[in-house]
């Protein structure tokens, strides 16, 4: 194991850069923090590149060959991590391969900008047993630190890929997958829609909703009725209600 004392060490500087999308894209790697996320990443062979700890006892046993471990001083570890009260362990991971096999139950996300909302929806899609999460233009970075923390390891369980949504919707429909949008106008209460063996659900931007051009391509648009005085539901909450209803 290598030890690093200084927060000015070049490795520390390189790891810190992974908080930026530019560096994540350049290196095809990302940083995770906390014991749970590291445990989930280690369940996927070939994902973890480096493990960073403050305490040697935090190093997981039975590591894959080739994973480099570093023990960092308090200052060096704090310089790398993003959370205010960081845990004792972090890891640098390779980006998962963007594989999108034949998907029969899919969540499509159009221009959702809040990383916390995105992470929650990835976690929901994983919990509901969907086949993939597909991100369109304008959607937050899936490997932003807040997105990763909100998803709680679901990035390692379900494909999260970027696609041109209009083109992908056309592909799904050609394969016989029913595509649902989310909109009040020309929409139906979700309770009226039967469960389905295959479906794609599109959820949209927190303020503007799903792009009008996408809504024109859907088979049907759904909404969650509001019975109180709230103007709307959080997009991640609405997505959870609809996904669980559609999948049955």
From Swiss-Prot:
GO MF annotation list: RNA binding; RNA methyltransferase activity
Cited Gene3D superfamilies: 3.30.1330.30, 3.40.1280.10
Statement: the UniProt record of this protein carries the keyword Nucleotidyltransferase: no
Keyword annotations: Cytoplasm, Methyltransferase, rRNA processing, S-adenosyl-L-methionine, Transferase
GO biological process, one term: rRNA processing
UniProt family annotation: Belongs to the class IV-like SAM-binding methyltransferase superfamily. RNA methyltransferase TrmH family.
EC code(s) of this entry: 2.1.1.-
Annotated protein name in UniProt: 23S rRNA (guanosine(2553)-2'-O)-methyltransferase RlmP
One CC-aspect GO term: cytoplasm
Principal EC category: transferase
Lineage: Bacteria, Bacillati, Bacillota, Bacilli, Bacillales
Protein source organism: Bacillus subtilis (strain 168)
Pfam families in alphabetical order: MRM3-like_sub_bind, SpoU_methylase
Annotated binding of S-adenosyl-L-methionine, by residue: 123, 204, 224, 233
Subcellular location: Cytoplasm
Cited SUPFAM superfamilies: alpha/beta knot, L30e-like
Free-text note on domains in this protein's UniProt record: Contains an extended N-terminal domain, which probably binds RNA, connected by an interdomain linker to a C-terminal catalytic domain, which adopts a typical SPOUT fold.
Disruption-associated phenotype: Mutant strain lacks G2553 methylation in 23S rRNA. Loss of the gene does not affect growth nor lead to ribosome assembly intermediates accumulation.
Domain of life where this protein originates: Bacteria
């Amino acid at each position: 194991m290598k030890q690093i004392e200084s927060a000015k060490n070049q490795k520390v500087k390189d790891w810190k850069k992974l908080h930026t999308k530019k560096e994540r894209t350049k290196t095809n790697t990302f940083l995770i923090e906390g014991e749970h996320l590291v445990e989930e990443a280690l369940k996927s062979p070939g994902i973890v590149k480096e493990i960073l700890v403050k305490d040697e006892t935090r190093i997981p046993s039975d590591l894959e060959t080739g994973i480099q471990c570093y023990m960092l001083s308090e200052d060096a570890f704090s310089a790398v991590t993003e959370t205010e009260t960081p845990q004792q362990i972090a890891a640098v991971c390779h980006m998962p391969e963007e594989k999108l096999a034949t998907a029969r139950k899919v969540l499509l996300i159009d221009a959702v900008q809040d990383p916390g909302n995105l992470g929650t929806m990835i976690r929901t899609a994983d919990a509901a047993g969907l086949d993939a999460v597909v991100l369109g233009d304008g959607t937050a970075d899936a490997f932003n630190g807040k997105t990763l923390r909100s998803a709680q390891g679901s990035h390692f369980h379900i494909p999260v890929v970027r696609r041109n949504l209009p083109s992908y919707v056309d592909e799904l429909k050609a394969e016989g997958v029913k595509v649902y949008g989310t909109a009040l106008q020309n929409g139906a209460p979700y309770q009226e829609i039967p469960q389905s063996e295959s479906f794609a659900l599109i959820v949209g931007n927190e303020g503007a909703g799903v792009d009008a051009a996408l809504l024109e391509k859907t088979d049907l648009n759904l909404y969650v009725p509001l019975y109180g005085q709230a103007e709307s539901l959080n997009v991640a909450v609405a997505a959870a209600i609809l996904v669980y209803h559609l999948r049955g």
